[in-house]
Amino acid sequence: MKRAFLSALSVGLAALFLTGPAQAQGNPGPLRIEITEGVIEPLPIAVPPFLAETPAASQFARDIAQVVADDLEGSGLFRAIPENAFISPITSFDSPVQYADWKAINAQALVTGSVSVASDGRLVVKFRLFDVFSDAPLGKGLQFVASQSSWRRMGHKVADAVYSRITGEGGYFDSRVVFVSETGPKNARQKRLAIMDYDGANVQFLTDSSAIVLAPRFSPTGDRVLYTSYATGRPQITLLDVNSVRSQGLGSAQGGEMSFAPRFSPDGRSVVFSLTNGGNSDIYRRDLSSGAQTRLTATPAIETAPSFSPDGRQIVFESDRSGSQQLYVMSATGGEARRISFGPGRYGTPVWSPRGDLIAFTKQNQGRFHIGVMRTDGSEERLLTSSFLDESPTWSPNGRVIMFTRETSGAGGAPSLYSVDISGRNLRRVPTPGAASDPAWSPLLP
């Protein structure tokens, strides 16, 4: 862990820089968490309840501050100091910070904020971040303006800004997750697409339970979702508009063909997927505008689960062409593939990190399932989890956290969503209303 100055960050939701007495004054605070070195002791941070500047903002002020504290603590990098430990309350957003009182309770960072309801009914949220031990603000304050229904997003935006200033990396709190919501007995599950905030709040269903759905994936802009649907009786790739909740089959499968495991290209213009015909599965690429389809692999093996590199030049996929299920990387235009997994066991469901540096995967070995990561050349393999059944990894927008499905054993076993950071620490269950599987993390919301 280091202490180093970070400059102010500009973010959306009608964000404005604040000016005033607490603005950065040329005395930069050197507070910083260096994530790559591994964080064992979370950084103590104080997030007092935000001040309500208008009577109607009272509950929003407390709730938004709680979202900020929960986001930061949930990352595993911070430890929120309980409110009953505070020595001096924050009574004015513009009053000078009493650094000695925060040092006395070992707070290394302090987040202050205020909330008001404007004449047009919108919420106005202001916040500042302070490096307590340097007696200085960390960058300029920010102000967000949005509808009252967006109050949780405003909390996530504040938390993302704090995370970014202290770690030097992008946040991931203002994002959503699409997943498969499951109900019913294990041998007759009903499956629906659902979407929620990254932390399990605001669950909404995108499909009904009339057809089984699998493997949803967000578009790069987060406004569309690809998934596999059994509405026609056989698996078919379907494209859903998140805002209108309208879906359409991409219609590539014919006769006895089955198409599944779709994923967008980084530019959102094409899709890679598996197509099975006559018992042989290969990987194809489809242009979404023209419908033109290109076969990328042509072997007798089962080849599936393709995932683009962030630059769109390569594809990682799973194949049993060597006799067991392993991971391969090939050009995005097809051609010769190189094997990158060589450890014991079987590897599957590879997903390229949005940072481009790692590939997440599922591994089965000696009766256990694992979520792991490796370099894109297959080196430095690390297993992050181990259980009866862990599968379906998906990356947070900043490439620092992986969400996945964990299913318990036995007749009553059911899947749940979990997250873990890429060091293998901070394993957490993501709350969902019922059984849930196949998570897919969106990019940061605009």
UniProtKB/Swiss-Prot annotation:
Record function comment: Part of the Tol-Pal system, which plays a role in outer membrane invagination during cell division and is important for maintaining outer membrane integrity.
Family to which this protein belongs: Belongs to the TolB family.
UniProt cross-references to NCBIfam families, sorted A to Z: propeller_TolB
Keyword Cell division in record: yes
Lineage of source species: Bacteria, Pseudomonadati, Pseudomonadota, Alphaproteobacteria, Rhodobacterales
Cellular component aspect of the GO annotation: periplasmic space
SUPFAM superfamilies: TolB, N-terminal domain, Tricorn protease N-terminal domain
Signal peptide bounds: 1-24
Subcellular location(s) of the protein: Periplasm
Protein name: Tol-Pal system protein TolB
Subunit structure: The Tol-Pal system is composed of five core proteins: the inner membrane proteins TolA, TolQ and TolR, the periplasmic protein TolB and the outer membrane protein Pal. They form a network linking the inner and outer membranes and the peptidoglycan layer.
InterPro entries: 6-blade_b-propeller_TolB-like, PD40, Tol-Pal_TolB, TolB_N
Gene: tolB
